[in-house]
């Protein structure tokens, strides 16, 4: 959710060797924040200050500017939902300004803005499953757990869930429901992908970290977002066809 050193950002592409890769066309301000897919395998790419739609081959369909700082996103029933923080990340309560922006998936027209003040450390990512949205975000140093905030289909707050993951750098960046579990991408270089059950009990930690995008794909696979920094704070993005959870560390007892 914040600027990262180049080595952390390009690590995904280094691990992509041998995997099918879908490139997002053009370059954008800020790094890739998240990816989402719809029922037709169109791909929605969230960069820090841009929202992009491509087809499954990576051909550009639409791009629109976005507020800084836009985060991870999800597609639900013809709409794209994006976690947005207009304030500060990773601070104690009172400094974030957390929102969910809702776009028409057809042409990326902005339809609605919904405040989510419960994300007190900054809204940075979101996913949808079983009639509910889960929004995740930043985390100040010194905390020993992460949080997942549950909202109903109307984006009304339901409850906060605790993930006993220990501290992860800047909290959780991306979220996805896949293969009967929640997956959460963090900026940790090692074991930065968290897997939980439906009740958010930690099941394991995995490498690579999926911190700039995770979304369901075809044939039982996922897309893993990767990003490459260029000059003048510009970035390219891509998605690698991959499968999360191949290398793990035993979950805490």
Regions inferred by a protein language model and the residue ranges of each:
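Beta-rich catalytic cores
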Residues: 30-31, 68-69, 96, 120-122, ...
């Amino acid at each position: 959710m914040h600027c990262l050193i180049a080595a952390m950002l390009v690590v995904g592409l280094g691990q992509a060797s041998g995997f099918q890769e879908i490139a997002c066309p053009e370059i954008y301000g800020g790094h890739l924040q998240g990816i989402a897919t719809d029922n037709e395998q169109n791909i929605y790419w969230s960069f820090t200050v841009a929202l992009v739609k491509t087809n499954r081959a990576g051909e550009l369909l639409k791009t629109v500017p976005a507020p800084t700082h836009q985060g991870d996103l999800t597609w639900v029933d013809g709409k794209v939902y994006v976690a947005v923080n207009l304030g500060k990340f990773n601070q104690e309560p009172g400094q974030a300004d957390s929102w969910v922006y809702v776009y028409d998936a057809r042409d990326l027209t902005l339809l609605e803005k919904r405040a989510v003040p419960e994300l007190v450390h900054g809204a940075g990512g979101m996913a949808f499953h079983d009639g509910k949205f889960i929004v995740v975000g930043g985390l100040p140093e010194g905390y020993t757990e992460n949080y997942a905030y549950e909202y109903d289909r109307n984006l009304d707050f339901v409850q906060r869930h605790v993930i006993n993951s220990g501290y992860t750098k800047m909290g959780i960046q991306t979220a996805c429901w896949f293969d009967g579990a929640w997956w959460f991408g963090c900026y940790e270089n090692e074991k930065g992908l968290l897997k939980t059950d439906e009740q958010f009990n930690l099941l394991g930690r995995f490498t690579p970290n999926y911190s700039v995008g995770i979304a369901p794909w075809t044939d039982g696979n996922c897309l893993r977002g990767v990003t490459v920094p260029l000059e003048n704070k510009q970035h390219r993005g891509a998605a690698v066809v991959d499968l999360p959870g191949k290398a793990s560390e035993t979950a805490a007892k």
